[in-house]
Amino acid sequence: MLLVRTTSLNVSRMPVPCLARGIGILKGKYRLANLMNAQPSVRHVSSEIQQKDQQAGESNTATDTGVIHKSDEETLIYFDNVYARTTSVWNPTLWYNLLLRNQSRDAVREKIRNLASPPNNPIYGLELKSTIPVKRDGGVFATFVVPPKYTKAQVNSLIQQNTARESSKNLLSYFTRASAFPVKGSPWIEDLRRLPSTTIVIKFQGPALTEEEIYSLFRRYGTIIDIFPPTAANNNVAKVRYRSFRGAISAKNCVSGIEIHNTVLHIQYENIRRGHLVSNFFTNHTRIAIPVLFALLSIFAVLVFDPIREFSIEQKITHKYSLSWDNKFWKQLKTLTSSTMTSIKYYWGGPDDNHQRKHLWEERIEKVNDLKMWLEENNNTFVVIRGPRGSGKHDLVMQHTLQNRANVLYLDCDKLIKSRTDPMFLKNAASQLGYFPIFPWIDSVTGVLDLTVQGLTGQKTGLSETKESRFRNMLTTSLMSIRRIALKNYKAFVSTGDGTVNVKEEDYLQQHPEAKPVIVIDRFEGKSEINGFVYKELSDWAAMLVQMNIAHVIFLTETVASNQRLSESLPNQVFKNLILSDASKENSRNYVLSQLEDYLYYNKKSKGENVKEPESEKETAENNDSDSEADTSVKKAEVILNEKELQEIDASLEPLGGRMLDLQAFVRRVKSGEEPSEAVDKMIEQASEQITQMFLSDKIDSNKSAQAWELIELLSANPVIPFHEIVNKPLFKAAPETGIMELENNGLITVSRDRGVLQEIRPAKPLYRAAFTYLINDPELAKVLKTRYLLKVVGFETGRIKKWEEELKPLGKVPDQKLFKTRLDYLSGKINASNAVITKCEEEIKNLSK
């Protein structure tokens, strides 16, 4: 069963000039006559679908079925340009209409009603029955009930005239003008993803129409550029190309489904596959296009992310928007409250925390002042502060020199060097510099892409980078941020009484050293087996900062090996050096007593012991003006402690020397409840375990372990060993400087130098000497380590003897032994000496095994 839906087409009332436009030949007139006598348009739709819908109780609206139903008393008009046409997915007018224009159903119906029957020229009795929007095409199908005194042709003509008149009143009518066309066919209401095109495809279900007939039928909807009639290969398809989208859209919606001489016309938009210049370039020139694409992506990433990274680095240095104590406003508030609380404490006789460390640093006040003075000088500031581990380099710079200074960047080389993987290294470097955002995973992706492109095109894209280049880029970006901070208050022109003066950037930086940020690079060693490039990159970067005069740079190091690296970066620069050593015995004692003052007082009070009440700090200062404030807390501690307790503390401090970190650890242990002697014994035991794990365990190289044990024995007996005594030791003869410097870099010893020449060898810190003695006095441990050392010496001497014996073999075959008597005597003496060493070592091993 087929459902036949008809649409009355009163052809006899159509204007003849409109239908006959462009037809000039007899054949065209003959076919036109046939067109005039065409039957009403018919589109066959299966009735089974409608029956199924009715049985299921579903709607049969045009939106759901794609078919418009109307009676003979109704006329169907298509209004175009009601919505924005979807000619492209990225058409901006769609968003404009969606956001700024009222597209509700009532608003559209009111607009159609005003166009068809305006108040100033109404069609009396005209009723708008329904509207069916086709937003993709930008139009609306409107069904009107024809008034009794009008015919359909008259109503259609009046609606067209009113629409043309009303839509042309707007100032923007050229763009917003609407048109009304009677629907001759049976339109198919579909919302498929078929975007409008200027070309429509006509499929003939029956004999094809001629070009004249096609022109006559479709010309009224817009200017036609060309008509492509059916071909021999495809004799039932024709194409019509319009100049504008409006013509093609109106023709498709008004004519589709019309039947002429038993031929039904089905019209759709042509699916045009436009050739894109960019896609063609990438398809046809792969070897060039892919590198160009990655280059463009890199440029885009730089343009977008580099300003963000520079801002984040500035934030890391200035802490302008940070809520930490490094923020400028928090620093001012902290200074104000700190000074206020200090005054209150002093008034009530409380302790002043600002002086608890002063006596330890009295011997370094001059160096702190020198460092502050260097930072205020106009000359390039390149400072190297060297001191043993735990000597207080970090506190000297960060707490005593730069505590209240703005714009400080602190870099810890140790965190960078110890990064095991490339992503972890990049994350640590970015965290140190404030470099954000960073995408470590991109390196893995770009590496795979680089290999893929190289396999396809034979050349690399250059997109993948090594961690060295990435780190160098981070430093370059940081340099730009530091320069911006240094020149923040710079003005190219300064007004004076005599006029305007042009100020150069170099002159401004020379006159305002306080504006330059301070870069502190801690734990700079100069060499490393893993990530050793960090030292070179940092030294080159620091040299550039100093040469550009945009920052002060301070290096904190433990050894002199860093000087060689820095000299390579700045060969003509004279470094400002600060050498830090351990505190004196008196200052160490004063520091510990000042830290333990309150603890000792309240500890004795809690035990019920009689404690002599010390005078308040204020009374002490008033009664004894000759004493400094720094000695006040020490005198309090001496009053609280008896002579025996003071002697115990003095004896406990003897192994610690003046190393600040060890003194702080000792104070913490005592405050936790340990006796001074117990605290120092545990520290010595802990240091000995550390030495054993780092230098004397089975996992360590046997030669290195034997060298370490030999130095431990010597340093346990003597606080200082001259370097020339080590040169003659068996295990150091081959490369004495290399062995000593390796142990120094690993933190077992420290070596003093005179113009680069090794002079004296000491333990890395005073506590190590007590740890050396502890290891020597431990019979079981000393027996194992001593035996291992002696076996290494025996092996070393045995190897030397074998080498000499190999040399003696050819000499023994010479007939005249007198020719090489001198060499033979030399080798014989060497072998005898080594034999004596081996014999001695074996005797010691035998004694140790008893």
From Swiss-Prot:
Compositional bias segments (type: Polar residues): 47-64
Disordered: region residues: 44-66, 607-633
Membrane-spanning parts: 288-308
Transit peptide: 1-44
Swiss-Prot/TrEMBL keywords: Membrane, Mitochondrion, Mitochondrion inner membrane, mRNA processing, RNA-binding, Transit peptide, Transmembrane, Transmembrane helix
Boundaries of every RRM domain copy: 198-272
Mitochondrial matrix-facing ranges: 45-287
Pfam families according to UniProt: RNA12 (PF10443), RRM_1 (PF00076)
SUPFAM superfamilies in alphabetical order: RNA-binding domain, RBD
UniProt-annotated location(s): Mitochondrion inner membrane
Membrane topology per record: Single-pass membrane protein
One of the GO biological process terms: mRNA processing
Mitochondrial intermembrane side: 309-850
Keyword check for DNA damage: no
InterPro entries: Mt_escape_2_C, Nucleotide-bd_a/b_plait_sf, RBD_domain_sf, RRM_dom, Yme2_C, Yme2_RRM
GO molecular function terms attached to this record: RNA binding
Biased composition (Basic and acidic residues): 607-621
A single cellular component GO annotation: mitochondrion
Purpose: Plays a role in maintaining the mitochondrial genome and in controlling the mtDNA escape. Involved in the regulation of mtDNA nucleotide structure and number. May have a dispensable role in early maturation of pre-rRNA.
Additional facts recorded: Present with 5260 molecules/cell in log phase SD medium.
Family classification: Belongs to the YME2 family.
Name of this chain's protein: Mitochondrial escape protein 2
Annotated source species: Saccharomyces cerevisiae (strain ATCC 204508 / S288c) (Baker's yeast)
Originating gene: YME2
